[in-house]
Amino acid sequence: MKLVKLNPDCIRDILICVESLKFGETIEFLDIINVLEEYDTDEVLYHIQQCEYNNFFTKTNHFAQSLNGRIYDLTPKAHEFLANIRSDNLWRKTKSAASKIGSVALPVLQQIASNVVEGAVKS
Protein backbone atom coordinates (compact mmCIF):
# COMPACT_ATOMS: atom_id res chain seq x y z
CA MET A 1 0.00 0.00 0.00
CA LYS A 2 1.45 3.34 -1.01
CA LEU A 3 1.29 6.45 1.13
CA VAL A 4 -1.72 8.57 0.34
CA LYS A 5 -2.17 12.28 0.88
CA LEU A 6 -5.42 14.17 0.69
CA ASN A 7 -6.49 14.70 -2.92
CA PRO A 8 -9.36 17.21 -3.05
CA ASP A 9 -10.26 16.14 -6.61
CA CYS A 10 -10.79 12.57 -5.42
CA ILE A 11 -13.02 13.78 -2.55
CA ARG A 12 -15.09 15.85 -4.99
CA ASP A 13 -15.41 12.95 -7.43
CA ILE A 14 -16.54 10.57 -4.66
CA LEU A 15 -19.18 13.04 -3.48
CA ILE A 16 -20.46 13.53 -7.03
CA CYS A 17 -20.61 9.76 -7.48
CA VAL A 18 -22.61 9.24 -4.27
CA GLU A 19 -24.88 12.19 -5.05
CA SER A 20 -25.87 10.54 -8.34
CA LEU A 21 -27.82 7.87 -6.43
CA LYS A 22 -31.59 7.78 -6.62
CA PHE A 23 -33.52 8.08 -3.36
CA GLY A 24 -33.21 4.86 -1.37
CA GLU A 25 -30.31 3.49 -3.41
CA THR A 26 -26.90 2.69 -1.98
CA ILE A 27 -23.52 2.40 -3.66
CA GLU A 28 -20.78 -0.11 -3.00
CA PHE A 29 -17.17 0.94 -2.61
CA LEU A 30 -16.27 -1.29 -5.58
CA ASP A 31 -18.73 0.60 -7.79
CA ILE A 32 -17.09 3.91 -6.85
CA ILE A 33 -13.64 2.44 -7.52
CA ASN A 34 -14.80 1.22 -10.95
CA VAL A 35 -16.32 4.60 -11.87
CA LEU A 36 -13.29 6.59 -10.69
CA GLU A 37 -10.74 4.78 -12.84
CA GLU A 38 -8.27 7.68 -12.71
CA TYR A 39 -7.53 6.84 -9.05
CA ASP A 40 -6.11 3.61 -7.71
CA THR A 41 -8.08 1.47 -5.28
CA ASP A 42 -6.13 2.47 -2.17
CA GLU A 43 -6.54 6.15 -2.97
CA VAL A 44 -10.32 5.85 -3.36
CA LEU A 45 -10.65 3.81 -0.15
CA TYR A 46 -8.51 6.33 1.74
CA HIS A 47 -10.67 9.22 0.55
CA ILE A 48 -13.91 7.39 1.33
CA GLN A 49 -12.49 7.01 4.84
CA GLN A 50 -11.68 10.74 4.96
CA CYS A 51 -15.25 11.50 3.91
CA GLU A 52 -16.48 9.31 6.76
CA TYR A 53 -14.19 11.05 9.28
CA ASN A 54 -15.60 14.40 8.15
CA ASN A 55 -19.22 13.23 8.47
CA PHE A 56 -20.01 13.40 4.76
CA PHE A 57 -22.00 10.13 4.73
CA THR A 58 -25.20 9.40 6.65
CA LYS A 59 -24.27 5.75 7.01
CA THR A 60 -21.73 3.26 5.73
CA ASN A 61 -21.36 -0.47 6.23
CA HIS A 62 -17.93 -2.05 5.93
CA PHE A 63 -14.98 -3.57 7.65
CA ALA A 64 -11.87 -1.42 8.03
CA GLN A 65 -10.25 -0.83 4.63
CA SER A 66 -12.55 -3.38 3.00
CA LEU A 67 -13.61 -3.26 -0.63
CA ASN A 68 -17.04 -4.58 0.35
CA GLY A 69 -18.37 -1.40 1.91
CA ARG A 70 -21.57 0.42 1.07
CA ILE A 71 -22.53 4.10 1.30
CA TYR A 72 -26.13 5.07 1.91
CA ASP A 73 -26.34 8.83 1.39
CA LEU A 74 -24.64 12.20 1.78
CA THR A 75 -25.17 14.33 4.88
CA PRO A 76 -26.44 17.91 4.59
CA LYS A 77 -22.84 19.01 5.29
CA ALA A 78 -21.62 17.05 2.25
CA HIS A 79 -24.44 18.40 0.07
CA GLU A 80 -23.51 21.95 1.07
CA PHE A 81 -19.82 21.38 0.31
CA LEU A 82 -20.64 19.78 -3.02
CA ALA A 83 -23.00 22.62 -3.95
CA ASN A 84 -20.10 25.01 -3.36
CA ILE A 85 -17.64 23.03 -5.51
CA ARG A 86 -19.82 21.44 -8.20
CA SER A 87 -19.18 24.20 -10.73
CA ASP A 88 -15.83 23.63 -12.45
CA ASN A 89 -15.17 27.37 -12.33
CA LEU A 90 -15.79 27.65 -8.57
CA TRP A 91 -13.80 24.46 -8.01
CA ARG A 92 -10.80 25.89 -9.87
CA LYS A 93 -11.02 29.09 -7.81
CA THR A 94 -11.28 27.08 -4.59
CA LYS A 95 -8.24 24.96 -5.45
CA SER A 96 -6.30 28.05 -6.49
CA ALA A 97 -7.03 29.78 -3.18
CA ALA A 98 -6.13 26.62 -1.26
CA SER A 99 -2.84 26.26 -3.14
CA LYS A 100 -1.75 29.67 -1.86
CA ILE A 101 -1.98 28.29 1.67
CA GLY A 102 -0.36 24.96 0.83
CA SER A 103 -1.71 21.63 1.96
CA VAL A 104 -5.09 22.17 3.63
CA ALA A 105 -7.34 20.00 5.76
CA LEU A 106 -10.80 19.18 4.50
CA PRO A 107 -12.61 21.57 6.90
CA VAL A 108 -10.36 24.41 5.69
CA LEU A 109 -11.13 23.49 2.07
CA GLN A 110 -14.84 23.63 2.91
CA GLN A 111 -14.40 27.13 4.34
CA ILE A 112 -12.42 28.28 1.31
CA ALA A 113 -15.14 26.94 -1.00
CA SER A 114 -17.79 28.77 1.01
CA ASN A 115 -15.77 31.99 0.82
CA VAL A 116 -15.33 31.59 -2.96
CA VAL A 117 -19.09 31.20 -3.39
CA GLU A 118 -19.78 34.22 -1.17
CA GLY A 119 -17.31 36.24 -3.26
CA ALA A 120 -19.01 35.13 -6.47
CA VAL A 121 -22.40 36.17 -5.12
CA LYS A 122 -21.12 39.61 -4.09
CA SER A 123 -19.50 40.34 -7.47
Model-derived features: positions:
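Short amphipathic alpha-helical interaction segments
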Residues: 37-54, 69
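Exposed, interaction-prone assembly regions rather than primary DNA-binding/catalytic cores
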Residues: 85-123
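Non-catalytic, well-ordered alpha-helical scaffold segments
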Residues: 8-12, 42-45, 72, 76-79
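Generic structural signal for hydrophobic core residues of well-folded globular domains
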Residues: 18-21, 51, 82-85
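A short, conserved structural fragment
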Residues: 52-63
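Short, amphipathic alpha-helical interaction segments positioned at domain boundaries
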Residues: 66-97
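Short amphipathic alpha-helical interface segments
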Residues: 3-36
